[in-house]
Amino acid sequence: MTVALRRSWAKDLDAATLYELLKLRVEVFVVEQACPYPELDGRDLLAETRHFWLEQPDGTVTATLRLMEEHAGGEKTFRIGRVCTQRAARGHGHTTRLLQAAIAEVGDYLCRIDAQTYLADMYARHGFVAAGAEFVEDGIPHVPMVRRTTGAAWPATSDTATETDQS
């Protein structure tokens, strides 16, 4: 069965697809991880937010992440967040496929992620390095990470812990 890689600007998402993306995120983060937090944070529909997902032929979303463009201090950077995969679909390289697509879009810009600590090694395999101390958000340990590209300056660690990936 072919799992299609999809990408969309927030403004171009149809209601049914947005529903499927949010449904998967709630299933993983709120229900599975027993983490009651406000999943709808207002960033999914921002003009510069992109969504990536893997979709079964029947339209079922298998995995998703969002890529947000940020302009802190006038510098364009990116942040990957809300990375998740259906429980039954884990271990098949879906997260790798999504990360590779998002990283390709980021190009030479600095990219941040606040990774759940137990996933830090997986993100390290994609070029991310720890950029600050571990912190706990919604009862789950996280570590701020950055992916440095050619010519990108290291960020100050004081501003890295602003958004969780909720992996």
What are these regions (language model features)?
Residues M1-D44, H51-T60, A156-T157, Q166:
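Short amphipathic alpha-helix that is part of the acyltransferase structural core
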Residues L46, G74, E137-P141:
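Short acidic/glycine-enriched loop/turn segments that link adjacent beta-strands
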Residues A89-A101:
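Conserved acetyl-CoA pyrophosphate-binding loop and the N-cap/start of the following alpha-helix
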Residues A104-T117:
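Conserved GNAT acetyl-CoA-binding A-motif
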